[in-house]
Amino acid sequence: MKRKWERDLGLQGRMLFTMFLLAAVYLFFLAFLSYSGTPPVFMLLFVGAFMGIQYFYSDKMVLWTTGAHIVSESEAPQLHDMVTRLCVIADIPKPQIAIVQTRVPNAFATGRSPNKAVVAVTTGIMDKLTPAELEAVLAHELSHVKNRDMAVLTIASFISTIAFYIVRYSLYFGGMGGDRRRDGGGILLVWLVSIAVWVVSFLLIRALSRYREFAADRGSAIITGQPANLASALMKISGLMDRVPSEDLRKVEGMNAFFIIPAISGSSFMDIFSTHPSVEKRLAQLEKMQKEMS
């Protein structure tokens, strides 16, 4: 049975405001590059090609990076049954399902659209969670698929990536041309503005990522009708992460942005640099939803 996908207007408002700020920063940056005489065509083409590959082949890249193995219904019947049932409720096509052989208890989703998605779980999470908790985690990942989060964040980071490459290479290549910038002062100005744009956009993209994690948590609660199950799973995963050997955690640290909980997380002081909200904030939202649904 399909469930109504109710909107959280406050969360949507924060996401839209963040995207508005991001767009404003990007428009300023493009206007500045045009005024300074910087020909951004080459950089646009280079970064566009790079991000196009990421956009269209992200699922294959992530599977290769993690060593995830696509499993058939005969190989993982219970997992397939769970995902099939959740997809009917969420009203999305069933994605491919993969398993990663690692003790790290985690899960992730990738793919540019609901029709080209992969949802993966680790053997660590399958061994430790109850069926209800695992179902809640899968519903969280399917919410990312339904919300097209991979596509949104790839597009959002496009100009930020251009700013990063200008910062990295402009001093080496004399600012990449442009009449107004042939002097050292002009090159330095472009470099400084690019740094500012990259830092601001980096923080905004991280904020957008955290909001979309909140949205996926909310989606899981709506799909399963049991926010407490995801809350229980998050607490269990967070606690289990401390018991996993640091060597195993470092192997998958590059996948933190995709995981339901980062394999290695910093202090609360570093929250503004994190792709995920703190577990405490996520639990507070789920507790509020549990009360609303009771």
UniProtKB/Swiss-Prot annotation:
One Pfam family recorded for the sequence: Peptidase_M48
Cofactor(s) the protein needs: Zn(2+)
Coarse class of the protein's main subcellular location: membrane
Location in or out of the cell: Cell membrane
Superkingdom: Archaea
Family annotation (Gene3D superfamilies): Metalloproteases ('zincins'), catalytic domain
Assigned keywords, A-Z: Cell membrane, Hydrolase, Membrane, Metal-binding, Metalloprotease, Protease, Transmembrane, Transmembrane helix, Zinc
Annotated binding of Zn(2+), by residue: 140, 144, 213
GO CC terms: plasma membrane
Cofactor note text: Binds 1 zinc ion per subunit.
Lipid bilayer topology: Multi-pass membrane protein
UniProt entry tagged with the keyword Metal-binding: yes
Family the entry assigns: Belongs to the peptidase M48B family.
Cross-referenced HAMAP family: Pept_M48_protease_HtpX
Protein name: Protease HtpX homolog 2
Organism of provenance: Methanosarcina acetivorans (strain ATCC 35395 / DSM 2834 / JCM 12185 / C2A)
